[in-house]
Amino acid sequence: MRMRLPGVTLVCLLLVATVTRTGGATEAVEPAEPAGPRTTEISYYYDFVRHCAARPIARQLDLGREVRRLSGNPRQAANVDANDQVQLPSTWWTPRLGFRPVTVDQMLRGPGPGTGPAPGKLIIERAKSQGVTPGFFVKDSAGTAFLLKFDPTALAEMATGADAVAACLYWAAGYNVADNAVYTFTAEDLELSSKATVVDKKGKKRPMDRDDLMLMLEHVPRGPDGRYRSLASRLLPGRPLGPFEYTGRRGDDPEDLIPHQHRRELRGLWAIAAWTNHIDVRGPNSLDMWTTENGRSFVRHYLIDFGSCLGSAATSKREALAGTEYFLDYQVIARQIGTIGLRPFAWEHAVDPDLPSIGFIDSDTFNPGNWRPEYPNPAFDERTERDIRWGARIVAAFTDDHIRAAVARGQYSDPRAADYLTRVLIERRDKIVRRWLSDPAVTADRP
Amino acid sequence: MVAIGPAYAQEPSVPTPVPIAVADSSDNLAPTASVPWNPPRAVHTHEPWEQAINAPLTLVSLPIKALGALSEAGLLRVQEEHQIPRLQYSLAVTARSGIIVGVGGIEDGSGLGGAVRFTPPRTHGWVRGSLAGTLRHYHRGIAEVGPRWLVASYVHDWRPEESFYGIGPDAAESDASDFALQAERIGLRLALSRGKRWPRELEAWVGERRSVLRPGKASDRPSVEDVFPSTSATLDVPQIYRMAGVRVALDTRTGRPHWSRGWRLEAQAEDFGTVNGDGLVFDGENDSPGFRRYSLAGQVGWSFMRDPRTLRLIARVVDIQPRDASRPPLLNDLSRLGGGAGLGAFEPGRFHDLDLLLVKFAYIFPLVEYGELEISTDIGAVSGDVWNTTRIDQLERTYSVILRPRSHRAPLGSIGVSWGREGARVRMSLGGVE
């Protein structure tokens, strides 16, 4: 008996731990004054492995989910009202297009003012050390802080254009984004702060000097006027708390009571991501900010970094298959094995527009019913048709003029590029609308 | 139901099926600073009934979750301390100093291993060396001097656990044994290639080889002399060969990520001349059993669709002709099948004889962006005379399903299973996949 006691105790402890971890039925939230939550970080590598390999397996073993699937009763978003609309206010999303009139001018102003740094010198505070593209943190002559990001050498205008266009679209769709604008400068416009730092090739942070700067600028494409082109992203107000996850809750935020995968705004984001081919929509491309406004401090949730959106993969152009399969897509693998590869992929019919400033995005092979990000997103995995229709409603509200104006934010020097991207976005929007909003069978009240 | 008319693309055709409760009623489109809506208490990830039916699996998964948490912490540290760029930098620095470290075995069946290649700076690549070793104690050292087209080389090989089951296609599985091979080779090689439309290759070489068969070192099977006593006389006897050979090839294969179109034809002739006692470079004992080896290999591929689905036919014939019919080559010089040499379901070295015939038919198709699958069958056999004694009923067959991780440029390796008459065998390789 004495020998068994530790085992029983262990099991009890594990049970308690399990219930506690999964949010036991008796869990109550103490009202508390919001204190600044701690800063968190997501490991890119872990996020990839977790969502590519571990979580898909765990989902297959989730008996509750299987019961729901078999009974045709998927779990609906937890923050919707009786009319199936997002309960407001929300620190994740603001009703804009699709719910309120938003003029083209309002969209272009976005989070504002949309003009990039003020004229004058830019002071480099430090070099960007995360992500796949180089960049600088700078302050303009008015003391406003920006992040400058650049295009890959051989694909001028691609990543910066995508970032500017997509930020505009996502703001109009209601999401919190940074104020992004295409901005050009010369090397003489840049000055180094005495405190400027760079993480060198050895992975060590050290003071940044002019040689470092010129070395980084060597790879930055220039326009015909010799000016460097960048994407100037105004730093968000408040204290950065790190990215949010598309699953679970931020435990130290008393206003975060709904698991993120059960939020309508994040589930419905799928439709907007599909429209804009934002296959890089994942935790690390988000940011929580500890914001103080109107005397109230709270966490506001942002989508950031749209350099891997539309036809851009940040450092290269998108592959034709982007948006058609996950990096490790068990469903596609099973289909391929079942047909011994004889069923063609839809993307195999895609035609590359051969527009380096766009990269690759098309509408002909776009399947609005089966679009997928680069690897599974927990909130997208939980989406129901109601969530998608909510997002599709937003997509539908973008007029051709909205789209044309947003594309113009990319400042593409080749008019064919702007025309192509505009046409593709219009056609992709139409496909989404036809698939999710026009079919009575689809819009019937079923999950 | 939402009705969207064709005009939605021109006007802000916001479908308004239901009124929306906008708590922040201002016309301001800026994000709200109001207290967000929340339910009275935290929403569970799973409903209580879901938690209940998932409880057993949740319990079982706790150690995995713990492992995941540890991995997350470790990987986050790797990221925050920039350890990947540091590693890349270190590898780049060592590469600049001429040192390249790699992972991989020494041919099939030698086990997992690694290799270090060294090209001293300022030698224009004319001096090269490499050392490779595996967990099964295989070793290989190579030193080369000269431009790529004319290379003088020295090679040392130690292969301690080479399988041997007897001579001929009927060798019994129960006669498993092994021998060790210690070999040294010195030579001069000329390699030329020309042509774009019809790429042609020519190689010719001369050299000397010293090889010594030793008792096998494997712990799970008897040494060769215990199972085949007649081989004991050939053990521990250094033998010298004078080698000369020529190989010509025509190669029109193209395609990415794997070669998917074109063909390759290759013919090779080698002479292993008898040396009585010492050679020019190496010391030996007795006279070695000289022989000539001729091999002919052909590959042809045909593909369809954009991400290539490829059919391949590969054939290889090897014909060894001893100078003295009563003195066949030593075990290590015989033709062999099994493992990566062909008939993958059989152990490497499962079949030995003078000659061999192997035909492989493969179909490769994409699974996902970074993976493809090969399904293939090998048909072949060893024989004393491939032209006269090979019989269809002696041909062995194996079937394989191989997963091949790939980049956009090339296959990166393979892992899969082959099965045949004697069972199934898992195969894995890092690199070395066409």
Positions of the model-derived regions?
Chain B
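Boundary at the C-terminal end of the N-terminal hydrophobic targeting segment
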Residues: 7-11
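Outer-membrane beta-barrel proteins
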Residues: 132-138, 175-181, 274-290
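C-terminal outer-membrane beta-barrel translocator/porin domains of Gram-negative envelope proteins
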Residues: 44, 48, 72, 76-80, ...
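Transmembrane beta-strands of outer-membrane beta-barrel pores
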Residues: 103-109, 120, 131-137, 147-162, ...
